[in-house]
């Protein structure tokens, strides 16, 4: 009888312990910090993005077309979330939905998939987002300047030698001129608990929360004077040392350099024996930290004379000849004022015609000579 009572007591004890354990577990479970079960979209805050393109200068560049869309990137300053990205055909307004917190936001025209001469990288981080030009083959330049690149101490040549990918491909010394690209950004956009944007700290120093886009591309002019101008038939050229990339959030060119082939040359005779050639090109501008030393920019110029055979080759340090242009549609200009002397040669039977084919003048670029 005593053994039976003992067994009943042990059973009741185990039941009580189990009951208390279940009760404690239920208390712990109900006290956990759990995410609410309603749609998380309700936790997001509507943020109105207004964009003004009036000073972005799109009409001044070769494309000349107004933007047809824009991209908006918003980055949580904690870095715990992926950027919120919105691509839209609306150019003036878009609404994002973001969590409470502090955000950095930038906008730019079009989407990353719509640029034929640009590529984007680092777009998952606000500080690293950048755009850069893409390689463009220039057989004549890579062939004719291969030795110069290997021995030159210009910053661009040294950077090129240090770049294994560029060195592996002899025809990737140049990149395409960038097409028009404009952007603006706001840092420290605070979205508080009352779902009100409290503060904007824009790079453009506006405080109304509107993005005022600015062109990342500038237009540079090149002008070269000649003695013996009557002997000039055609020219081709490359400018090396200009900026290859642009930081979107910092809104300035980076230190990486590139070279662009220059086309669209026009020639003007000043006297019977003097004249000049000129053109313009589009670029991200001068690299960050540019100091206007001669070897920071080089103009690589080939001049074919009217005999159709003689080619004069020049590698001109022009980094100290950059100045602000007085022309409305040109930002900076490089002018070689000391005339280059061209020797006297006999004209071919075709005269100054542009139909002469020379075997070692690949990708011939003609100029209009105004006599």
Segments predicted by a language model, with ranges:
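N-terminal secretory signal peptides that target proteins for export/translocation
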Residues: 1-13
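Acidic/polar, low-complexity intrinsically disordered N-terminal segments immediately downstream
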Residues: 34-143, 323-371
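Sec-dependent N-terminal signal peptides
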Residues: 10-23
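Short, low-hydrophobicity acidic/polar segments
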Residues: 81-214
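Tryptophan-paired
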Residues: 69-120, 232-326
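Solvent-exposed loop and beta-edge segments used for protein-protein assembly and interaction
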Residues: 41-43, 97-101, 203-205, 212-216, ...
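C-terminal motif of bacterial Sec signal peptides marking the signal peptidase cleavage site
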Residues: 28-31
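A sequence/structural signal for flexible, mid-protein segments enriched
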Residues: 168-271
